[in-house]
Amino acid sequence: MKLTLEDISKNSEQIFYNLRWNGEIACPVCGSVHVYNKDAGKLHICADCQTRFSDTSGTIFHSTKLSLSKWLYAIYLFLTSTRGISSYSLARYIHVSQSTAWTMLMRIRTCLGQDIKFDSTDVVAIDEMYLGANWAYKPGFKKYRQAGSPPAFYNLNEKDRKSWYKKKFYELAAEDKMAILGMVSLGGPRRARISLIYINTPERKDFVKRAVLSRCASIMKPFFVDTPMTIVTDQSGLYKFLEQELDHNNQPRFNHQICRHDQNKYASADGYSSNRLEAAFSHIRRSWRGVYQFWTRTYNQLYLNEFCFRYNNNLSDKSVTLKRLQDFFSRVDPRAAVHFA
């Protein structure tokens, strides 16, 4: 069953009621279904713990002054936009201010947590990307090129000069970019899934190790599975720990496949490639530049969760199923702190 814009405009309250309770009202505190109504059904009282709650209690719609039709319309646009929707565009569509639209979108994103676990049947590609301004457009780059060239620089050809510029300036500008760790499944019985994590610490090696092991090594292999989990990376030193991890039989836990990008080789010796993850990174850059123009480090993980939700749920079609819409009515308090791995 699909939900249309006409349904949202006419029966928003009934749609919300049906999706929130699914035919049976339950207390958000103790979970009891022994509930009686008050004020013509607008207020519910739990018979066990005496908690008073409404249909919007414990959701992102709690204490809102906007109509439910605008909220449902905002979620509809959020889900059906291929690369996301900016707060300015949403404000024009539902006739609210830009700050109100931004708050609505951020509340929606708080429901999009990542709970991705890869098992031994998956082939996982891991890579990192750095989101930020192009190194050639950074302030002071031309001055650095003029003053920072070594004497041997003038003996290099044009191609090697550009490589030297790029390498040296990346070292200076790396701290200004947002480092993102990406993991995507390349094969297996299930559909491809992706997990994106914002690296918000200078200790990147330790952070990457904890993040990878929490999603790939936390699920122990069955005893009858002798083949290690295959992980595909580039030649970066961030992933050397994969060759040192052992399982309960003191055997390598991972089959580490390396794509030598520095040698212009984009597939490992066994034919594995990380191009699917590179394609996902290109979509993130297009959203960052074309839709949102910019977002701060503070909310970087929320935007990454949004991208993962689109990728993992295949929201390319222009329709919203009731099951997808019901995910936003989970008991999430937007005023609580949101923590990420």
Question: Model features per residue range: what roles?
Answer:
Residues M1-A341:
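Residue-level recognition of single "structural anchor" positions
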